[in-house]
Amino acid sequence: MNVLESFSLKGKVALVTGGAGLYGRQIVEALAEAGADTYIASRNIESLQQVAEEETKRGYKVTALQLDLSQDDSIEKLYNDIIEKSGKCDVLINNAVSREHGSLGWDNSLDDFDKSLRINASALFKITNMFAEGMKKNKSGSIINIGSMMGTVGVENGNYEGTDFTPATSPLYFYEKGGMHNFTRWAASML
């Protein structure tokens, strides 16, 4: 076996949440090129369908599915649809993040925190738990959570110099990414 074959994902099924954005798009391309049947899911189905069409033209199998992380039934439907279509999910990449709730600095209401945490923390727990249970039954699988160094070190706006990306200066982003790092450690110890 050569080196590239050892990294092959042929016969594997992968899900990327938030698969049309800055990082998600590159993750989807890599999984598809490695041979995985790749699902991408988020609220913006139009953007996902565009990514899926582009990857299909390149000869890869990428399927766009609707997902609203603020709704439990949407997470459950996504899981059931993937299992029904593919029979399993070998790789879950939690990449989606919502930044629509919250303000700069201290000007955040508890309602903003609750809405943001529902999507970026509670839904992370639910989707990870659902897919992990299936992976445990299959005795195989990988879960990758896309965090940020901002969840560990705090504000580092210099990281964005020279890019067209706007730094996250709402405390919600740092709070949630720090939580994601620790949730990932906990989940790894339990699985």
Locations of regions flagged by a protein language model:
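Conserved glycine-rich cofactor-binding loop
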Residues: 13, 20-21
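Alpha-helical segment proximal to the catalytic Tyr-Lys
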Residues: 133, 189-190
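Catalytic loop of short-chain dehydrogenase/reductase
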Residues: 144-189
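Conserved glycine-rich Rossmann-like NAD(P)H-binding loop of the short-chain dehydrogenase/reductase
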Residues: 36-50
